[in-house]
UniProtKB/Swiss-Prot annotation:
SUPFAM superfamilies: Composite domain of metallo-dependent hydrolases, Metallo-dependent hydrolases. 4-imidazolone-5-propanoate binds at R82, Y145, H178, Q246, T323. GO terms for molecular function: imidazolonepropionase activity; iron ion binding; zinc ion binding. It is found in: Cytoplasm. Belongs to the metallo-dependent hydrolases superfamily. HutI family. This is Imidazolonepropionase. It comes from Brucella anthropi (strain ATCC 49188 / DSM 6882 / CCUG 24695 / JCM 21032 / LMG 3331 / NBRC 15819 / NCTC 12168 / Alc 37) (Ochrobactrum anthropi).
């Protein structure tokens, strides 16, 4: 394979995922030209511009090319694991009971605060490598296990370093409003003050966050508390995202939409008004079947409402130590189909085009269109449905990141 960024993939089936394409935008007998790390042409081989005819050709032998996969919701940077809580839940404890007893997110805080930045990078890289091995070229990574200024900064710096250690685009999200740390003794107002006046200004000053997130739930923060964080984020010109309506309907989806959020995530209890508000605002619904499966939820996100409203839907692993220790977007797609009844096209778009949209990156990646980064996944499959259908099997042939094979 050429160690350069200008060449042609020939003899391929290509799923462009273009905005105006029908379905997945499939093109048979297609070629994709890469020039200087960007997509220069994608389409029928017989229409290839003459200027690319001399480029070295790589025969795909009729394999399928899709955009590189995008995991748009992860908590990839964390220390330790919570296998003991998994056992507790197997014995009957609920997520809420574990959290209120001092477990859950707060139990990860102790581990992260004790870890160095180097420790965090070292522990996270194997999880990132698992995603990369399945064709992921872009990953979002949240903080939220530090819950104080220095630890949140440490988390975000570790996340940024992942993109230096591996050929992958990393988008960082500040999730200070994730849980109330034990030292606050239940004083949520004072903690939100700390998020707004201490953590966020320091993080913004170092340009460490591409977005600001919050956990809007009875066991975390209420809508008025999240609104304070979002107002502060907007003052720093940082876009927002929201963990919303996972365990109850606090109208988090509508709250996110009112701030033109990039995405609202989980959404098991979102109602029709929330779905409509998201569609109007262009806020992507990021569905997380790994968490639904792992904590044995019974309330499914309202996929039919999202379809009816025209709300864009993405899928993500939600990789985290407590409720979704999942490092496979291929399995996530299968779960989206089997658990949430999403279609094959919705699942594949959900980990490419719509996931890129949820990160504000659709102008750069997520579809195979001229001028975008040559982020590609090439699969040894006959039809796209195989990517969603198989369980525990990885048919990736080649992964391309910004033109580099």
């Amino acid at each position: 394979m050429p160690d350069k960024t200008s060449y042609i993939f020939s003899n391929a089936r290509i799923a462009t995922l273009g905005e105006n394409a029908e379905g997945l935008g499939l093109i048979d007998n297609a070629v994709l030209a890469v020039k200087d790390g960007k997509i220069a042409y994608v389409g029928p081989e017989n229409a290839l511009p003459a200027e690319y005819a001399s480029f070295e050709k790589i025969d795909c032998e009729n394999r399928l090319i899709t955009p590189g996969l995008v995991d748009c919701h992860t908590h990839l940077v964390h220390a330790g694991n919570r296998a003991h809580e998994f056992e507790l839940r197997l014995n009957g404890a609920t997520y809420e009971e574990v959290a209120r007893a001092g477990g859950g997110i707060v139990s990860s805080v102790k581990n992260l605060r004790a870890a160095s930045e180097d420790d965090l990078v070292r522990e996270t890289l194997p999880r990132l490598d698992a995603l990369i091995a399945e064709g992921v070229t872009t990953v979002e990574v949240k903080s939220g296990y530090g819950l104080d200024r220095d630890s949140e900064i440490k988390s975000l710096k570790a996340a940024r370093r992942l993109g230096e250690e591996r050929d992958v685009t990393v988008r960082t999200t500040f999730l200070g409003a994730h849980a109330l740390p034990p030292e606050m003794n239940g004083d949520k107002a004072a903690y939100i003050d700390r998020v707004i006046n201490d953590m966020l200004p320091a993080i913004a000053a170092e340009n460490l966050a591409d977005a600001v997130d919050g956990f809007c739930e009875g066991i975390a923060f209420l809508p008025d508390e999240i609104a304070r964080v979002f107002d502060a984020a907007k003052a720093h010109n940082i876009p927002v995202k929201l963990h919303a309506d996972q365990l109850s309907n606090l109208h988090g989806a509508a709250l996110a939409a009112s701030y033109d959020a990039l995405s609202a995530d989980h959404l098991e209890y979102t109602d029709a008004d929330g779905a409509t508000a998201m569609a109007k605002a262009g806020t992507v619904a990021v569905l997380l079947p790994g968490a639904y499966y792992f904590i044995r939820e019974t309330q499914k996100p309202p996929v039919e409402l999202f379809r009816a409203a025209g709300t864009k839907m993405a899928l993500a692993t939600d990789n985290n130590p407590g409720t979704s220790p999942l490092t496979s977007l291929l399995l996530t797609m299968n779960m989206g189909a089997t658990l949430f009844r999403m279609t094959v096209d919705e699942c594949i778009a959900g980990v490419t085009r719509e996931a890129a949209r949820a990160l504000g990156l659709l102008d750069q990646t997520g579809t195979l269109e001229i001028g975008k980064d040559a982020d590609l996944a090439i699969w040894d499959v006959e039809r796209p449905a195989e990517l969603v259908y198989r369980i525990g099997f990885n048919p990736l042939w080649k992964r391309v990141f910004k033109g580099q094979i």
